[in-house]
Amino acid sequence: MRNKTLQDNTIVLGSCQDVAPLISGVDVVLTSPFYNTSTKSKIVPREKLGNANQRGRYDTIVDTYTREGYCDFMVDLFNKMHDGLQDNAVVLFNISYSTGNPDGYMFALSDIIRRTEYTLVDQIAWKKPVCIPDISTPNRLSRIVEPIYVFCKKGFEKTHYCNKPEISQGAASHRCYKPMYNFVEAMCGNKEKDEKKCPYNAATYSIELCVKLLRMYAPKNALVYDPFMGSGTTAVACKRMGLRWLGSEISENQVKWAEDRLKNAISPSIVEGKFDD
């Protein structure tokens, strides 16, 4: 049973390594961890750095682990989350690369599969409407697509949850399902109307992306955990859809920012993308 200090619909100020062992009954993990691709991250508030070339992505975490350290961090997190997830739960893991570190995250993914009780079952391409053009290299592409990796517990590859509609019934071997494609188009960052850009986090995904992913993988009244809650985007999407959420975040500034966003989040009764009754 979950530690009673962890209430639904809360964001805990603290490391995911400390919070993950306390979760239970989680249906979906939806997150975008730090990519470990920064070369200029500093433990100072981003808004206090006048020179854009000096700014790190985050106000607290230094995004420059060694390759081995980053792999160990992610393996440790997945292992600590294991008992708190439903057996049919999925982990939706948005992670990518940089020109300077194009393969580092591949080692982390490989170690998660080799060293934890999770395995990879799907990959989703997130197509952004725009991206920053790569004009500084002669042979690297501009990254307008980011991957989202879908993990489940080993042994549940055929039974993990997915909202894929059944279009014909019969014996299990003869059932047919409506196609659900591994390609999602969604805006990037907090660019919705009336939403301010978070000064403490320069690497956010969008509410639109979260809603589309949760409609694919979250059951009704699901409990969604984001170990890297950041500015609160996952929680805002959950509130809009009438889902429950838990989050962990080491930045006090971002926790306060997320809580303010949640106070103004739109009711699920007027949001396209909510679950039908």
Q: For each predicted feature, which ranges?
A:
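Conserved phosphoryl-transfer catalytic core
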Residues: G50-T60, N264-D277
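Short, conserved SAM-binding/catalytic segment
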Residues: M1-Q7, E259-K274
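Core catalytic lobe of class I
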Residues: M1-W257
